[in-house]
Amino acid sequence: MTEQTSTAPPAAPRRRRRWPWVVGIVGGLVLLGALVLAAVLIALSVGGGGFSSSSGSFTEEYVSGEGTDRVAVIPVDGTILSDNSSPEDGLPTTTPRGLESALDQAADDASVGAVVLRVNSPGGGVTPSAEMHRNILDFKAESEKPVVISMADTAASGGYYIATAADSIVAERTTLTGSLGVYIGLLNVSEAADDFGVAQNYIRSGEFKTMGDPLRELSPEEADIFQSIVDEDYEEFVNVISEGRDLPEDEVRDLADGRVYSGLQAEELNLVDRIGGLEDAVEVARDNADLEDDPTVVRYVQEPGLGSLLTSRFLPEPPEVAQLLSASGVQFNGTPQYLYVPGAIRSDLNR
């Protein structure tokens, strides 16, 4: 029997498909990039970046005048928030760090002889309002340059608080100001929670550790504690107005019952010095600083930061209910507020 051998070449080994590995690697890189981008967006959004909300230099926008002396106009727009706040509604806000940065730039510019703060704010947090008040006092003491407040549509509550640090206050006839007082907003959804059978259990270290829980009614003892905080902040507000406006404290208490005043009413009550617009405020600043007749007026402008641009483009909008609450200006975070709530709505609608 003859053995036959094949002369055909051996079959080539079958190549393994590598594309699943490639897809896996690419997918992993895409996922990693998305996570990094999300982390960057969150970090940037926490730092703010809206107008007057972050540190950094401001560009100058020419307003009027031809003189060598200059007056810097610094806008103070929107709700007053702490430096680490991150508003989600896109409304204008202002922070102590942003104001301090603008004032530092004006202090370092030898050609700037005076500053006008154009305030259009319903106020905001007690602490950031006090910080901005100190920023203005520190600027005046260190630079020896006068500061004049020019009130726009709204300069109420915390917006008025910061104004008391200025040398002069000029208000429009139609400005809404006043709302001199403090509140703490606490959300109460206890009835809705009962309807849906929702309850929250706490293991706490003290009787009042969970005071302000929105899932239950506030007890009388808890209300007294919150009221004591409001009373302390109210006394500080009265003291600031009394010192800044040279008014007796008893008279300030009569005025500071939470009501709003028009610009004309505020002038009659000595809460502002005169009626006028931005040009009038510049004139007062010029006279206070003894500048030449036609000083150059520039407005400090800060473009939206990278964080604001990226978050507004890529992050989803909050639910409609959250947007409505935020746009209303109502704060339910349990912290004291120098805030005129209807003023917040008005400021938003006028933009």
Task: Please provide the spans of the model-predicted regions.
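Short alpha-helical basic/polar micro-motif
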Residues: Y160-Y161, L264
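Alpha-helix C-terminal capping segments
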Residues: I162-S168
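Catalytic-core segments of hydrolase enzymes
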Residues: V148-I149, G178
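N-terminal organellar transit peptides
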Residues: M1-V148, T154-A155, S168-A171, I184-R351
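Hydrophobic/aromatic ligand-binding patch that stacks against planar heteroaromatic rings
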Residues: Y161-I162, A192
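Short gly/pro/ser/thr-enriched loop/turn and capping motifs at secondary-structure boundaries
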Residues: A155-S157, L176-G181
